[in-house]
Each structure stands twice: as structure tokens, then as C-alpha cells.
Regions:
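A Zn2+-metalloprotease active-site environment signal
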Residues: 6-17, 24, 28-257, 265-288
Length: 288
């Protein structure tokens, strides 16, 4: 991916190396990041959803403001994250008014290492990247990308950009009013149906990441040969079925919260081809 021409975002806060009083506990960083990789694909990231209620109640009272460095990070990965976020801002601030008749309010991005505080409660690398709707912020420990490469051979800048764009996709869902409605519904239904709703939310975020890539490529010619395959490979590697097989040795469809590899690939491709928010309506789709 050609990202050197992307405008870097001014919405990045860099908390790397700041740590937390008490740290991340006894877990080594390797363990934490592997758990995070599983977490990301198994549905921990929209923590407001299933099982997230306790996080939200826990989030408010103990929430202490932690201030990181503002401005564009100097290191390569930090600059990359800032550039991709800046590009999602440029795309969505055009596309959202055009296609959904809404102004785009950009989210914040917090880079952290090991552990930090979020508006949704404590954040650890173990959780993988996630979006917190309460403070409209994406949280990521960038070592997640190294693990994608190392554990799943799912590396590459466009694959990493897809991860960030997926989280920004949750923010777009939030802006569209979808997240609050889904959350409310999830509290009224059983576990299996609540999981189904999560899958729809996740596949929509994959599709919206595709919509971003479509417009980014149209305006900045950002995609290079092999990029799409790279992101599709990442989507495939981190599908719920694949990860469940690796961790449990069997597949349990009812507990899918992100969608299977095939579904993730297909919805990412759908958004990428169409470039339309409407094409991402996983709630109306007859086939997920
Ligand atoms: Zn997600």
C-alpha cells in the first residue's frame, strides 16, 4: 500500500511506554498479545456487545484521564497508524455526508503498550485492538501487527490498515446509530441470537473497511498489486472458525462473534468493490 502521501491525523494520542500503576500483571507480553489476537477475532473487540455490560459499569467510576503525547509519532509504525487514520478521516468525511447525509465526527486513536485506561474500562494488549463507543476511541497496541505476521503469516501494511479500518468501521456504525440499537436488542435476546447480532456488526465493519479502501484507492491510488490478497488473507486467517479450530480443535458456530473466514473475506470484498455503505447492510442481507 502506498501510504506515504496520506495526511497524518491529529487525533492520535501516543501512550506507549507510559505503563500503568501496577502494570499488566504477571502475564508476559507474548502471552498477552497472542490472547489479543484471539480476542480480536473471537469478538472481544466491540466490548460493548456480548459480555460487555460489566465493562461499561466498571468503566465510568474508576476512569482516570491518562494523557499521552499528541502529534505524529516519529517511529515507522506509529506514523503508519497515524497516516491510515488520517486517510480514513479524509474518506469518511466525504463519503458519510454523500451516502448517509451525516457529518463525520472523527474518532480518536490511542496507541498504548501493555495496558491503559479507556472509556470502556481497563484496556490490555490481550484484548486486541478495539473501539470504545463511550469515548469514541480506537485502542491498539501496535505489537498486534507483529503478531499477525509472526503467528498467522498475515502481515503487510494493507493487512494492518484493514485492522485499523475495521475498528474505524465500528465508529462509522456508531455514527449511524447502529451500535446502540444492536446493544439494546442484545439485552433482550438469548445468547445465540446475541452472537448472531455481533457477527452482523463485525461483518459490517469488515465491509466498511472495504468501502474505505475503495475510496482511498480511487483518490490516492493507494492500492498496489497484492494488497487486496494480503487483506483477504488476513481476514481469512482471523476468521472465527479458523481460530476456534486452532484453539479448541472444533468449530462452534453459535459462539461465532466475528464471522467465519469465508464471511469476513466476502464482506470485505463486497465493500471494496461497491464503495457503498448501503452494500454493507448485513442486517438486511439474506445471506450473511
Ligand atoms: Zn470488530
Amino acid at each position: 500500500m502506498r501510504w506515504e502521501d496520506f495526511r497524518t491525523s491529529s487525533n492520535v494520542e501516543d501512550r506507549r511506554g507510559m505503563g500503568l500503576p501496577g502494570g499488566a500483571g504477571g502475564l508476559g507480553i507474548g502471552t498477552i498479545v497472542i490472547l489479543g489476537l484471539l480476542g480480536w477475532a473471537l469478538g472481544i473487540d466491540p466490548r460493548i456487545l456480548i459480555g460487555g455490560a460489566e465493562m461499561m459499569t466498571g468503566g465510568g467510576s474508576g476512569y482516570q484521564q491518562q494523557q499521552g503525547r499528541q502529534g505524529t509519532p516519529q517511529d515507522e509504525m506509529g506514523r503508519f497508524a497515524s497516516a491510515v487514520l488520517g486517510n480514513t478521516e479524509d474518506v469518511w468525511s466525504t463519503v458519510l455526508p454523500q451516502q448517509a447525509n451525516r457529518q463525520y465526527q472523527a474518532p480518536k486513536l490511542v496507541l498504548f503498550s501493555d495496558a491503559t485506561r479507556s472509556g470502556c474500562g481497563g484496556a490490555q494488549s490481550a484484548m486486541g485492538p478495539f473501539y470504545c463507543p463511550l469515548d469514541q476511541t480506537v485502542y491498539i497496541d501496535l505489537s498486534f501487527f507483529e503478531e499477525m505476521q509472526r503467528r498467522f503469516r498475515a502481515g503487510g501494511d494493507f493487512a494492518y490498515a484493514y485492522v485499523l479500518a475495521h475498528e474505524v468501521g465500528h465508529h462509522v456504525e456508531n455514527q449511524l446509530g447502529i451500535l446502540p440499537r444492536v446493544q439494546e436488542r442484545q439485552q433482550q435476546v438469548g445468547r445465540a441470537e446475541a452472537n448472531q447480532l455481533s457477527v452482523r456488526v463485525e461483518l459490517m465493519a469488515d465491509c466498511l473497511a472495504g468501502v474505505w479502501a475503495h475510496h482511498s484507492n480511487q483518490r490516492w491510488r493507494s492500492l498496489e498489486p497484492g494488497d487486496i490478497e494480503e487483506a483477504i488473507h488476513a481476514a481469512e486467517a482471523i476468521g472465527d472458525d479458523r481460530l476456534q479450530k486452532q484453539s479448541q480443535g472444533r468449530v462452534v458456530p453459535d459462539s461465532f462473534t466475528h464471522g467465519s473466514s469465508e464471511q469476513r473475506m466476502r464482506w470485505l470484498t463486497t465493500g471494496l468493490k461497491a464503495g457503498q455503505i448501503q452494500a454493507c447492510d448485513t442486517f438486511r442481507a439474506s445471506r450473511l
